[in-house]
A protein has these predicted regions:
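Metallocofactor- and cofactor-centric catalytic cores in central/energy metabolism, strongly enriched
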Residues: 1-422, 429-449, 457-518
């Protein structure tokens, strides 16, 4: 594995990295390089920690060991790793939603019939996958290392898991569809950053306290990433909340369910005050203490951040407000297809490079592009770099009023996106449309679960990160050939991950091969 030469495709990120370096920290890139060389067995799913007899590994070249201690071979071990990664992603999303609002625990998953094209729903019914219910999470069949016929059986349950995950996203959409941000950015205010998943009642109380501030210095409240709650301002963190620490943060509230363990020690190292909070603590006390810490830190900090915090800048026109226009543009050939990008930067590749390459290729081909996930938080940075790369073609394309680029800022918007695309489908299945959902960069199991959800709904899904499931040729064949038979979903990826330009050509070719319904 080569060391990292280019950390990000965003030029404005460089001063932040240098500022961190000057303060003695190489951030996630330095920690990644300390792990090199990475374990090739793990990278291909050829190791197993399921029991305490191991951990076991499989030699992919025919030499020993060819089986684990229990006797499982490469196909069974890799399928088990795939199953566990998917299940973990579904549970991660479920726990996140539950931690925000415990009342959602008692809600059953909504019916998915209205979200599926008729033929897709019929096929899933014939396979016994629909309807899906929460309780099925505990009944899905993983391989259990039983026998090889379970490869196909487990793929059926991966599809079921994908639909259950989508059901959770529908619950999220319904619960927070009426919630909107009402806070204004105070340029001279102190910046307080929340990391993790406080409850909705705590977030609502925090928002009220920020809104009710009067006189003197005020506090800006920021919520990390796109966690489905559009009630706070978001800012461009350049792909990692670690960079946020170099941008002028004054205090952090960190909850136990945060996904970023590095933030605590980095904040302590850089003398940024942190407050470790529990979910059920009195929020007024936490807020008062956090506000005081932030304001005091702002008074005494001596350094000037190389890139000060400001709200994320993105087009104000939603793709959902343009249904009729998009439909007519597709019919008239003004728009040649649709690319949906969802994902989060991965340290193994230059942040946003693959994302930008796909965006530029699609926009140059007059395709509609919708970007979601953590990439959407950095919409302003992406637009600026796209404008530089595209030159004279950029103005009309990136224009918020009539351009082909838009952003989705919440995981809870995925069901609305699916409904939007179904309306455009004219009765066809999603994989028959000039449409690709791409994950050029992904990190967490929950992001992989989103990809499985789109596959389970019958979309063509492209993945631009090396997946740890390619140690089994038999499983690779099942994933690539059998998924279309179950849901219609098409997985556009391969054991040998192509470069960004090759993957962009693959995306364009797939979309161009699907005709627009006149």
């Amino acid at each position: 594995m080569n060391r990292i030469h280019k950390k990000s495709a965003i030029p404005q990120t460089v001063p932040l990295i240098l500022a961190a370096h000057d303060r003695g920290e190489s951030l996630l890139w330095g920690r990644y390089e300390e792990q090199l060389p990475l374990c090739a067995f793990t990278a291909n799913g050829l190791n197993c920690r399921k029991c305490f007899q191991g951990p076991c590994r499989i030699n992919p070249f025919g030499d020993q060991p060819t089986r684990g201690v229990c006797g499982a071979d490469r196909d069974q071990i890799v399928m088990e790793n795939l199953f566990r990664a998917t299940l973990e992603g579904v549970l991660e999303t479920s726990r996140s939603i539950s931690s925000i609002d415990e009342s959602l625990d008692g809600q059953e998953l909504p019916n998915l019939d209205s979200d599926l094209p008729r033929q897709t729903g019929k096929r899933l019914m014939e396979h016994g996958i629909l309807p899906v219910r929460k309780g099925q999470l505990w009944g899905v069949q993983n391989s259990f290392f039983s026998h090889k016929s379970y490869l196909s059986r487990t793929l059926m349950d991966l599809t079921r898991l994908g639909l259950i995950h989508y059901g959770f996203l529908k619950v999220l959409e319904k619960s927070f569809s009426a919630v909107r941000n009402e806070l204004a950015h105070e340029p001279e205010g102190a910046n307080l950053y929340i990391v993790g998943h406080p409850s909705l009642s705590q977030l609502t109380a925090l928002r009220k306290m920020v809104r009710d501030q009067s006189g003197g210095k005020k506090v800006n409240l920021w919520l990390q990433g796109t966690r489905g709650l559009p009630i706070f301002l978001s800012f461009s963190d350049h792909g990692s909340p670690e960079m946020a620490l170099a941008m002028g943060l004054d205090a952090l509230i960190i909850y136990p369910n945060s996904n970023f363990p590095a933030l605590e020690y980095l904040a302590q190292k850089w003398e940024i005050p942190i407050l470790l909070a529990e979910k059920h603590e009195e929020i007024e006390r936490i807020a008062r203490e956090a506000f005081e810490l932030a304001l005091n830190h702002q008074k005494k900090k001596g350094h000037v951040p190389p890139s000060p915090i400001s709200p994320s800048q993105s087009p104000g026109v939603s793709i959902f407000d343009r249904m009729e226009e998009v439909h007519e543009s597709l019919k008239a050939g003004k728009v040649k297809g649709i690319l949906v990008i969802w994902g989060e930067p991965n340290v193994k590749q230059a942040f946003f490079e693959r994302t930008l390459c796909l965006m530029e290729s699609a926009l140059n081909q007059k395709m509609l592009v919708a970007v979601g996930g953590d990439a959407a938080v950095n919409a302003g940075l992406l637009n600026e770099e796209l404008a530089r790369r595209m030159g004279k073609n950029a103005a009309d394309t990136l224009n918020a009023a009539n351009g082909n680029l838009s952003y989705l800022h919440s995981w809870g918007e995925i069901p609305r996106l699916v409904s939007f695309l179904k309306t455009l489908s004219s009765g066809r299945e999603f994989h028959q449309m000039p449409l690709v959902v791409s994950f050029p960069e992904l990190v967490r199991s929950s992001a992989w679960a989103v990809a499985v959800s789109f596959l389970s709904l019958g979309f063509a899904v492209q993945v631009g990160t090396q997946l740890p499931f390619w140690g089994s040729p038999a499983l690779s064949e099942v994933l690539l050939k059998d998924w279309p038979k179950i849901s219609g979903g098409v997985l556009l990826t391969s054991p040998s991950l192509p470069d960004a330009q090759t993957q962009a050509r693959e995306m364009v070719s797939y979309i161009q091969s699907r005709s627009v319904e006149k």
